[in-house]
Each structure stands twice: as C-alpha cells, then as structure tokens.
C-alpha cells in the first residue's frame, strides 16, 4: 500500500521523523518497502499572478509577461507556454532558483527582451500534471507563497508491504490507529457527521446470499454535478497513493477506500431498474465490467443486481453499463460488507482483480459501512452538490467474534519478559482490544476490524509488537549441557562419513518410501511394510535395504553422462520383527566407472570387487573381517561375499546382478556394499603397541591349493598357528596357468616378522615359517617350488 506521510500525519502526528516512523512501522510488522519524495528537490519557486501579457515583438510563440510574485514590484518574464494569460496564477522560479536537474535560473535576454525568471509547468518541477503548458493554480492560491509549501511537495510517499492477515492496515485510518497504539500519540480521526436526508427517494435493498453479504447500505443522491472538478487536495492524495484521478464521484469512492478502508461503488440511478438485490449469479447471465472485460457469470459468483439484470460483481468490480459518468445526475451509493470466503480467489480465477477485491478477500471492518457512506455522502454534496435521501440498510449474517483468553504468565514465558498485568492491559487497550481480567487471565474481545485475532498466540504477538521487539532483552538461554564420555570401542557416525568422503565417496539422502519393485529385486522381499497412504504409487513401501536407492541415484547420474560415480548413504531400514517393526541403521556404498578419474599418469581401469573390499576394510579398521562366498538376490552369483565379524554376519559386498544391470540401464555393473552401522562404527579396544627399532624380516610363501580353497580359509589356518614374531600376512599374487595343474591355483603370501627386543635370525624365522606351512597343509596346500 502506498500513501502520503502528510496525509497520515493529519490523523496522527508522533514526534518522529520520516526515518524513525519508517523503522517503527517495519518493526511492528507493517514492513516499509521504500520511502520516496513526492517531488524532486528544487528551491526558489513561488506562486505568482500574471498581471500583463503581450506578444513578443520578435517571436510569434513567445509572450512578454509581468507577474506579481509577492516581491512588491512586477517582474518581467518571457514565456512560451500556450496557456499563459492575464489573471492566471502559476509557479514562478525567481532568479537564483534551482530547478530539478540542477538547472539554475538567472536573468537573461530572450530575443532581445529581458526575462527575470521562469514560469513553470508541472513537468519542469517534477510534479505530475495533466495540463499542457504552465501549471495552473486555483484563483485563491496565495501570491508569494513557496510552491513547495502550497502543494505539500516536501511530502514523503510510504510503500508498505502488508501481510495478508493485516487487512485492517490497508487504509490511512488503520495505519494511523497502529501508529497511535505504538507511540501513544493522539489519534485525530476525521469527524463523520450523519447527513440528514433532504429528499425521500430510496431504492429497496434485499440480501439473498446472506452468508456472503453480511451488510448492505445504499443511498440515493440526486441532482449531482458529476462533471465537477475533483479538489486539488483530494487529487494530490489519490495520486500520491498510486491512483489517478478519474472523475469527482469515482475519486470520492476511491478516496473513501484509501482513507477509511471501505470499498464503495456509485451507480447511475437512471440505469437501475427497481430495487437492489445481492444474490448469486444465474445461469446464462453475463456482465461487462468496468475494465471492458465481459464475464460469463456462474452461480458461484456474487452479484449486485436490480430487478432485471446484474449491475456489478459483488466485492470485485462494477459493471460498465451501470457506472457513473460525467453526464450522470442522480447516483446510488453502495457500502457493503462481503465475507472474505465469498470473494477469495474469485478475482484470480477471472484473471483480474481490484483494490476492492484485494481488501474484501482479506477482511473489511464489518462495522464501518455506515461511517463510510455518510463520509462519502458529505464529500459528494460538498464537491458535486445534490440532495441526499435516507440510508437504506439490510443486515444478514455478520462474523461472530469469539473471546480469546490470554494468560499473563504465558506472555512472560513466550516473550522472555516479565510484564505486569497492568502493562499488558494498557497495550491491549491501545490496540482497541477490549477485555476483562480475572486471576491474571485476560478474556479479550477482538474488534470488528481485526480478523486475525483467534488464539492466545495472536494476542501475545500483539503485545510483543507494541512492547517493541527491540526492547526484549537478548538473554542467551542457560544450558545444562555437559561433556559426555565417548566410548573407546565406538566412533561417531560423522567420523565414518568423513572417512568415506575421504575415500572419494559422496553422500546421498534418499526417501525411505520406495518402489515395491526395488524390494523384490534387491532384497527378495515379497512382503514389504506397506504404507496406508503413500505420497505416490512408486513410493508405496518402506525400504529394507539401501541398495535400491543407490542404484536409482546411479541410474540418474548415468543418464546425465557422469563417467564415474561413488556414493554412500547412512540411514535406517525397516524390517518386520517379532515385536512389530525393527528400524536398524545401515551404511551402504556404491562404486561405478573407472577406478581413478581420467588422467595421463595411469591407464583407465574399471573398479572391481577388491577395490570396494579395500574400502570396507578401511571402514571396519582396526577390526578384521572375514569374507565368505554368499548368495544374495541383488548381487552377481559368483561375485558376492558375506562380511563377518567375530563369526557374525554384519553385511554383504559384491557386484550387482547382471539381470538388474540390464533392467535398470546401468551399462556395466557397479560394486556395492551394505553393512550394519553398529558393526561399522565399532572399533574394538585400542591397545598401544611399541614401535620396534629392529629391522623386520620378510619371507614369501607360495602355495598350490585346490580351486575350492579360499584365501580366507588359509588366513584363518595361519592365525591358529602363527608364531608371536609374525606381524602380518598378506596375499600378493594369485596365479593359474602354465606350470599349475588343472583345478589348482597358486597363492603367494608375504609374511612379515619382527621382534621388539632383538634382531631375528634364521633360527627364529624358520620355525615360524614351518608352522605356517603345516597349517596350510591341513587344507591340502603344498609348497610351490
């Protein structure tokens, strides 16, 4: 909403400058988007009357004038405006004046004739003006007075961003009421005296749509001069509020809208057949609106109709046929209350709106209609003349205000400020919120203009606004937090996330609601936990594995031409359990594409099972896991392993099944893992080990074993018989081919031995190696020579 600061200060004038007033309104919830000057800066311009005006002897289009500018003598000024004439009063820039754009006025000669000033147009002063030529002022404009003072050009224009719940602030009356409440300044509203009827003419009013229209007032005014000019003061206020002047009657209704907040409409009485009825539109009816758009009316549309036809769309826009023109002599003034729910959304459906619909759909004061019609009638009689008939009023169903309770203790708790009941009561009174008080509990009745007071929190907000948010102390809350001991056998989940991110994985977060197909394909789950009210058909069950979500993200990245994808997710899965549902946490990862990002130093190779196995080992470190061949519906039958810790299965690792690679359009198979989060964050009791200062000894052990014997079996056998000096055993080569019999394979292990107290000798090393060889022989292994 845009309005003039001077207009507001005629209602309430707090001891604040423009900037302070702007800040006050913003902090009270009426955000000031901008303030701009009503006119650009200029000086030295006064009101002057043209006393003489003759044709310039050397120029056909110039006039030589002598003007009275209140200086005590006539001033000669050469002027080229077409509307300059004897007797007109106009703005006059005297020598030394500075006009917008730093244009300085000084004595000069024009075609040989001396000119000591400049007669100004509105454009030259930066003031909107419809007249082509000089700005013509009223005949009673005081000669010699500064034009800035006379036109109020030192005004500031405020633009407020009013929230939808504060329709009561969409008027000068409403904003002034707020400023008075916030500052304690005296509110000086316009006195509204009822206009005594001087004629008996009426038009009967009937409300059929009683829930949509709670109150309707109408008044006949006859013998008006609709062509009368709108007073300059009213025109200025309208223009500074963003509305253009149209005609006196229309300007008056718009003025009431801005001043009082009550939308009004004026009908040409001669175009009304019979009485006025507020009803729903009927099938087949249409209306040509004031914006020259024809609306095919529907029963959901509220209309103002006479005995023969619709005249206007209630609360939205009047009709072109029944509108007032400068030729109108008799008018019918309308002032009504329409329920917000009856108007809301209708203008947007039609593709156009109005200032009236904007206010009605947010809520207009349902006690304001009579004041508005009396104020409008008074202005019509003063500006356009005429005789007014009595006001006809019909009341249907008006909103009912429920009392709201406000506890003083609750105010203190929410705002963090101890406030006495007297202080709270004073704030409520300043906001026109009537109340009764008993046992520190206020029972508050909201006024007719406040549609947003419904619950206790609404009242607490009002108290806070007037008390001032800046006055609420910024007290930091006292916390009872204390540092908790961190268990040594577990690590934080965030540390696990950082570890995976450090290994070039990117974390994803996916929905726990998944496609039923994913559960069947990746978990072999034919009885997933179903949602009673899924948000989409493809999100109808709860996941029991994280694999489906990772595969889906991979498919999306492949479609976007990503060459290399490494993902992980930490989240819950949902399983059926003996006592209902279990929600264990899992960590899962997926790797697809080249092992390394494209570079010149290494050949591009696809990631494989063992790359991801290394990531899993790093994830579980220092705990050693055992890997056993396994079958899983999501994984390749021959490239899948169960991850076991202390003899218990804690996860699975493998290459995605070729069937799902093809079904989900993945080009080639990713390698995935999924682990119980509890196993992934466990790290065992850390035991400090001294660093030996003696050189280690390495021996290699090459064994021929059957294809069925796994590395894990051999490592397990070694562990049972390894000597104390054996620090580490690692596989470094697997060979099949020439020199190795069919059905056999060669496995080569490096054995690292070290003692913390001495250098090892062959006498120490050989028994240790022999013990390992004996352990391997129990699995049918032979030393390869």
From Swiss-Prot:
Co-factor remark: Binds 2 magnesium ions per tetramer.
TM ranges: none
CDD domains (UniProt xref): PheRS_beta_core, tRNA_bind_bactPheRS
Residues the entry annotates as binding Mg(2+): 452, 458, 461-462
Catalytic class of the enzyme: ligase
Compartment list: Cytoplasm
GO cellular component terms attached to this protein's record: phenylalanine-tRNA ligase complex
Quaternary organization: Tetramer of two alpha and two beta subunits.
Name of this protein: Phenylalanine--tRNA ligase beta subunit
